[in-house]
Amino acid sequence: MAVNVYSTSVTSENLSRHDMLAWVNDSLHLNYTKIEQLCSGAAYCQFMDMLFPGCVHLRKVKFQAKLEHEYIHNFKVLQAAFKKMGVDKIIPVEKLVKGKFQDNFEFIQWFKKFFDANYDGKDYNPLLARQGQDVAPPPNPGDQIFNKSKKLIGTAVPQRTSPTGPKNMQTSGRLSNVAPPCILRKNPPSARNGGHEADAQILELNQQLLDLKLTVDGLEKERDFYFSKLRDIELICQEHESENSPVISGIIGILYATEEGFAPPEDDEIEEHQQEDQDEY
């Protein structure tokens, strides 16, 4: 069972945000650049696996989580581990998944003290434990791309390059049919080179189209996730509608309020997405 830590006061023992990030990255072999990126909950799940082997089913952890309902799923896994090990700590899930600095910094400060009180110094291979999966930081286009590129300059991390690997391989394959890259740089521009530049541009546009499709699919799942919750609330309200409660009436009024051009998803579509989510779990 775990040793509980109840102190939440700020003391000289608390690490700065930079030191805290360094500890997280060094311990789990990550490349987080902001405290806010802990909002996915994946890092905490693996820390629990490090402290108490077997208390977390890492296969259930969504290491590539990018949407809020996926963060919530990870924190549910963490809550189950807390309960299993007798950790008396209420996880402020609703605050953490919003990705605000202060909420996440306060929680990681507590968790660091909890970790120090329970860690026995045994060896742990985080990459092996998560089967080589990379813990993807929550989407932040400006910082994420820049920091990822900077990391690749000095560190060879195969899984970091996987999202763009196929695109680069295809482009390299096309260019190699003409001449090595060094020769292409020496030759003056020509119509032949222009054709390959057009091919590279087409590949880039296709990749952008794929990225947009994945984004839309994720947003649709998130929409249906919250819509299903509203349907559950609607059913509860309908069961008690005969009580003439002003609270129930107010909730129903909010549920049925619409704006021009709004169209709720069809029931079949919601059930299909819900089945896909269950299959992922």
Curated annotation (Swiss-Prot):
Composition bias, Polar residues: 158-175
Region (APC-binding): 217-260
Superkingdom of origin: Eukaryota
Locations listed in the record: Cytoplasm, Cytoskeleton
Residue numbers bearing the Phosphoserine modification: S162, S176
Domain Calponin-homology (CH): start-end pairs: 14-116
Annotated signal sequence range: none
All residue ranges annotated as the EB1 C-terminal domain in the record: 194-264
Pfam families assigned: CH, EB1
Single annotated GO MF: identical protein binding
Function: Plus-end tracking protein (+TIP) that binds to the plus-end of microtubules and regulates the dynamics of the microtubule cytoskeleton. Promotes microtubule growth. May be involved in spindle function by stabilizing microtubules and anchoring them at centrosomes. Also acts as a regulator of minus-end microtubule organization: interacts with the complex formed by AKAP9 and PDE4DIP, leading to recruit CAMSAP2 to the Golgi apparatus, thereby tethering non-centrosomal minus-end microtubules to the Golgi, an important step for polarized cell movement.
This protein's domain notes: Composed of two functionally independent domains. The N-terminal domain forms a hydrophobic cleft involved in microtubule binding and the C-terminal is involved in the formation of mutually exclusive complexes with APC and DCTN1.
Subunit and partners: Homodimer. Heterodimer with MAPRE1. Binds monomeric and polymerized GTP-bound tubulin. Interacts with DCTN1. Binds to the C-terminal domain of APC. Interacts (via C-terminus) with CLIP1. Interacts with SLAIN2 and SLAIN1. Interacts with APC2. Interacts with SRCIN1. Interacts with AKAP9. Interacts with PDE4DIP; this interaction, which is PDE4DIP isoform-specific, is required for its recruitment to the Golgi apparatus.
Family, as annotated: Belongs to the MAPRE family.
Protein name: Microtubule-associated protein RP/EB family member 3
Species of provenance: Rattus norvegicus (Rat)
